[in-house]
Amino acid sequence: TNKNWAIKEVRQTEKNDVALVKQNLMTEIEILKKLQHENLPQIIDIFEKNDTYLIIMDYVEGRTLKAIIDEKGEQPQEDVVNWAIQLCSVLDYLHTRKPAIIYRDLKPGNIMLRPDGRIVLIDFGTAREYKTGQDEDTTSLGTKGYAAPEQYGGDGQTDARTDIYNLGATIYHLVTGKNPNKPPYEIRPIREWNPSLSTGLESII
């Protein structure tokens, strides 16, 4: 069919918690197998050999938004808004599954930009299904600076609002070039950095 595939390799090492690695991997695979959306990759198959997992999946051509912002700094507002709209579409899709899927680690490093302008959300290793009646997550996961307060544990179960918080932090980073994952780990009104930015976008963030 002349279609390119990507192979994601996950190795079990003595330093890894083997059970946790396998659990996260199986979670990622089971979630992605059930999903079909233009901003998500498709899982094709998985193999286990010699303490190594090989995941065959769609090859996503392009670069991560992290690589782009690391090289070029803040991105044009028009581009960021376009990416944000696409991210809202895929998050809405995830959050309206039964049960809802919470991504939990939205950040520029987990977003690929294809040459045609379409973004693809990658790496579902921290994603989880929302469990009605559960007080908090079994394992607290997320990236400092982008993570919502409840992701640090003890403040309730992550839900759709968690991903929206992550999205706001991601948009902030993209449009200002200021990384919330670095000291002082704060998010300020975007027009303090660039007065030409939209007041509407500032309010949304």
What are these regions (language model features)?
Residues 14-34:
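AlphaC helix of the eukaryotic protein kinase fold
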Residues 46:
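Activation-segment/catalytic-loop signature of the eukaryotic protein kinase fold
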Residues 50-64:
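Conserved short submotifs of the Hanks-type protein kinase catalytic core
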Residues 65-75:
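AlphaC helix of the protein kinase catalytic domain
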Residues 83-84:
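Activation segment signature within eukaryotic-like protein kinase domains
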Residues 89-101:
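Protein kinase catalytic-loop region centered on the HRD/HxD motif
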Residues 145-205:
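C-terminal lobe helix-coil module of Hanks-type protein kinase domains
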